[in-house]
Amino acid sequence: MDRVSFRVEIGTCLGVLTPNGTGKATLIKMMAGLEKPDEGEIHRSCRISFPLGFMGGVVTKHTARENCRFIAKLYGIDPDYVEAYCRWLCGLEEYFDQPLGTYSSGMKSRFMFSLMLALDFDMYLIDEGMPRSMDVEFNRKAGEILAERLRTTTIIIVSHQPEILQQFAQKAAVLYRGQLTMFDTLEEAKQLYDYETQS
């Protein structure tokens, strides 16, 4: 990324369109504080979530229940609440008491998404939208929770698919060849994204 500079206000959903392999993971990790920029500074004035899909905080040989309680203690939140919330949202039933290492990638994504939403952040970082799931009930609950969080928090969704951003994004940006261009609407961002990626 080259001289990327932007500001995100609390209570906004920013959708960032970017092709795979063009700095998407780097952008998210720097916002979360997992990587430092080579130059410049990142100023954070709120509590920012770990990126959805980041498994660095959990232990795969432990069960979902054990991971919930461990992460809750790290963040100073009631372990019983975090466990109950995750059980309710991810709907893994008996698998909740099995090691994460035995989960499919879809099950891991559902668990990590539920764990992230169980914790109280001002800003949530989401890579490629909600986990893809055939579970209609999970999709319904997760969508409703995200819409509700938008009223009081900031959500940043980074994706290479404009349709993933359409449901939630209020403002948009395009990250391409190291440059980040901000737009007031997703439709404006999509026009540049389509031009850059199809030319």
Per-region residue spans from a language model:
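H-loop (His-switch) and adjacent beta-strand-loop-beta switch element
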Residues: 168-185, 193
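Conserved H-loop
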Residues: 53, 159-167
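ABC-family P-loop ATPase nucleotide-binding domains
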Residues: 47, 52-136, 144
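ABC ATPase nucleotide-binding domain signature region
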Residues: 10-73
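Conserved catalytic loops of ABC-family nucleotide-binding domains
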Residues: 145-159
